[in-house]
Amino acid sequence: MTFRELNLRIFRREPVKRVLWQPRIEHWYNVNKAEGTLPERYAGMSLLEVFDDLGCSVRPYWAFNDAQRYEDSESVRHEEVVEGPLSTVTTHTPAGKLVTVHEHTSVARHTRKYPVETPDDVRVMEWILEHRRAWFDVETYENACKTIGDRAAPCIFIPRINIMRIMIEYMGFENGTTALYLYPKEMEHLIAVINEADDGMLRMVADSPIEIVNYGDNVHQALCAPPIFTRYVMPEYIRRNEILHRAGKKTYPHWDGDCGQLLPYARDCGFDGIEAITPIPQGDVTLEQVRDALGDVILLDGIPCTDFLPAEPIESLIENTRKCIEYFQPHLVLGISDEISPVGDIERVRLVSEICAGAVV
């Protein structure tokens, strides 16, 4: 059975006799390649060749995501000015303009100024969303299928859910949280516009050939506390899932922050799985808490990324790998919560491959 077939069988809840090991090593590879610090063994390899050498599957968002196409109105114009490490993008629309400032390093980007700061900015963002269209690029999808082959099933992650998009992309945490209390009417309307505008995206995904759909939300309970989660996020999760399930899709969100306060709601959101729940010491939950909260909901990932740091005892990696298999298999796509660090020991990924190959399930 190929990794692709195994991947699909897990989400279709068909019998499986193997553990699917699907770590995300892309950031490790990209940073070390850019810095010239790839280990000698991998220096001449492509990313997929490294995956193959390590004996593991790939979670191929990066290959399939570009099949999602989002186009703004022709009357929207973006103007970029670069000054040293700072790039300033001014978005001009018939409703007004938005300004975003990013600071760049050789391997990363940080937002210095978010585009939405005032109620007037909210209205401009709403205009952009109301005039945006989504379509699926079949040619890109077919090329991605050829690139990935049998290494994994096709999958994508879709734009963040309402609150997480506001907190991470549009306003930032401080301004976004403040605005919810200072401008509740305007923020309620923005959330409603985001939800409605997402319908075009949901129709595009529902009509696409991709079966496995991730909600790339980066949920953290500090950004999305239970009262906010249950009021704005959970109802939209349920609505999205009903639409995509009717189209035969399998869904899961990306919860890579502290989520102990949100786990009690995990089974009520209508997901097939949940990705990237981060155990202690980096997150705030134990694997036992995750097991008890999820029931038969599929866990994607599970092994703390700290276990892949060179200074950490190898015994912890072995123990947590075996716990994940014991607690969650067959409802498991084993991975790293959230991904291996650029300074991680890549040979520990190979060790997990060997454990999975010998696992009796």
Regions found by a protein language model. Give the residues of each.
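Segments that shape or occlude catalytic/ligand-binding pockets
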Residues: 31-72, 76
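A contiguous, low-structure linker/loop signature
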Residues: 75-131, 151
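Generic hydrophobic, aliphatic-rich segments that mediate packing or membrane embedding
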Residues: 47, 83-87, 140
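Active-site loop segments of alpha/beta catalytic cores
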Residues: 1-37, 101, 123-361
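Short secondary-structure boundary micro-motifs
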Residues: 4-5, 62-65, 72-76, 86, ...
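Short, solvent-exposed loop/edge-beta patches enriched in aromatic
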Residues: 15, 52-59, 83-85, 94-95
